[in-house]
Structures are given as structure tokens and as C-alpha cells.
Amino acid sequence: MCLRADCAGSNKPIAKPDCKRFGCSAGAKGGFCFTVGRWGVSLVKRSFMTNSSSLGSYDILTKRFSGRVQFAHHFLPCPNIRHVLFDFDGTLSLIREGWPEVMLPMFEEMLPPTSGDEPAGARAMLLDDIMTLNGRQTIFQMMKFAERVAERGGVPLHPLEYKHEYLRRLEVRIQSRVNRLSGDAADPVEFLLYGSIALLDGLVARGWSLYLGSGTDEPNVKREAELLGLDGYFGEHIYGAQDDYKSFSKKQVIERILTENQVDGDRLMVIGDGYVEIEDGKNVGGLAVAVASDEDNNGAGRFDEWKRKRLLGVGADIVIPDYRDAAVLLDVIEGK
């Protein structure tokens, strides 16, 4: 039985078959950050109190990890998962690593100045807009920027025009990476988040169905998945953004997975570094693994603190920096 209390003020558990995970726990609030290093396991209390038995169970779990991991207070194993939805950029692929360094300067360049404008303040505002919308289709960042232009008395371009110019600039940045991969001059692992293949192989070995949903335009996602050797894991289940932004969303992908397979949300796990897939997965009762990846330092095993805090805030069950502990992670999720 799954006694899952949704965090909407209700203390009444909702019964579902087979799963043993809570969406909300009355006995604990907040989360713990566990760091495994040379001197063993350290437990850092974030912002809540819990009972000693809970502390003990978390401690036992994290001793199994060689790297960093953070469990939300509501995490419990869910052994009935059979479908897994991945985000792409920053979750598996690093081909587009550094994309904010393209988008932010473009926005700064095109943002109308105002009297008494503080460049640092405008930059912080734009960066917050960009990262808050990370995980959604690129067009939403462009729509938000168009609003900022109008707020300052400017006449914004159509959001698609901003998007196409951004993609043109981004293509210049990543072209050498694409060329190296397509010409076999680079090993795909160089542009995969650390441990990605081990995780994917572990999921395939369990017989779980894999899906890829990205805010990047679908033709680019399919091209880059193929360059990285990931297309075989996902087959026809690779979905990406369209110019008609209303025709695609990660929420729609999740609804399609559940409908076509005639399953409830507790059969679903979402894995991503953006708030959208985490939030959408949790909204249907799925388990959410947040990847707070430090893309600039792949393999270092460090959290990106902005991602970590943001993803915990939208309900992530587990936060990891990469997949160095892929086998342990899957065992813990299954309750082994």
C-alpha cells in the first residue's frame, strides 16, 4: 500500500497499491544533506526536526553512496516504477553546456536602458528570469524577455525572433563540439553527465521504459542524442520543443506516458535538472530525482547550489550531482 499525503494541507493519506512512498510526512519537515568524503558520512540538518529512527534510516542509506546525495523528508522507496522520463540538457547531455552565457549577454545587449539603470541589477534580474524558466521550452524565456523590453518602454520583437537569434548564437558556440562528435574526434562520454551510461544501462536491465523530453527544439534533441549514442535507449520516445509552443510540454509528455500505458503516476520516475519536469512529475504522484549538476565541472561530484535549492523547493525526492552512484541509487529507489 502507498499512504501518500499530498502536501496541500491535508493530513489524510491517499491509498494506492504497491507503492511505499509518502508525498508528505507529518513527522518531519525540510531535508538533510549528506556528504560522503574521506572522513566518512556527515549529516547536515537543514531546517527541520525528525525522530531518531528517521535519522538512522537516512544515515544507513547514505552510507551506501560514495558521493553526495540529499533526501527530502518525504522520500520512501517505490518499487513499482516502470517508466522513466529524462530531461536532456544538463541531465544527460553537456553539448549545450554554457548556454546561459549565450542567452544572458544577448538579453543584456537588447534590453532598453532606463534612467538610473544599474547594470548589475538588470543582469541579476535577467539571469533570474532565465534560470527560473530553465526546463521549459526556450520560447518561454524569450516571452519573458519580451515582457521586460515592454516594461522599459521598448518595442519587443516577436519571441520567435529572439529565439531564432539565440539559437543562431548558441549554434556558433557548440558547433565545434558537434563537429568533433560527428567526426569521431571526441568520445561521447566527454559530453555526457558523469555516470549517464551506467544509469541508463541499469534502467534497461530492469526492463523499464525510457522517455526523453526536452525544452530544446526536437530536431536538435534527436540529432544530439544520436551523436551521444543515446538514441538507442529511447527509440521513438524522444520529444522536444516545437515552434508552436502550445503543441508540446513536459506535462503533455507525462500525460501521454500515463495514458498510453494505462498506469497511475506512481509508476513514473522523472529525472532532471529543471524545475518543470520535477514539478510536473510530482503533480501526478511520481518520484522525482533532481540532478543539481555542476555542468562547468563535470565529474567533480559537486552540487550546483542554485539548482539544488530550486529543485528541493518544487518537491524533489532525491537530489544528486551526477550518476556516480547509479547502481546504489536504483537499489535505494526500489527499496533494496
Feature map (PLM): residue ranges:
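Active-site neighborhood of HAD-like aspartate-dependent phosphohydrolases
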Residues: L55-A124
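Substrate-recognition element of Asp-dependent hydrolases with the DxDx(T/V) motif
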Residues: M103, D187-F191, S196-E226, Y239-D243
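A metal-dependent, Asp-based hydrolase signature
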Residues: D128-A205, S209
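A short, structured active-site edge motif that brings together acidic residues
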Residues: L160-E161, D231-S247
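Short acidic-hydrophobic, aromatic-tinged amphipathic segments that line or gate anion-handling sites
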Residues: Y239, I318-Y323
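Conserved Lys-Pro-Asp/Glu-containing loop-to-beta segment of HAD-superfamily phosphomonoesterases
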Residues: F248-G281
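Acidic, Mg2+-coordinating phosphoryl-transfer loop and its flanking beta/alpha structural elements
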Residues: V270-I318
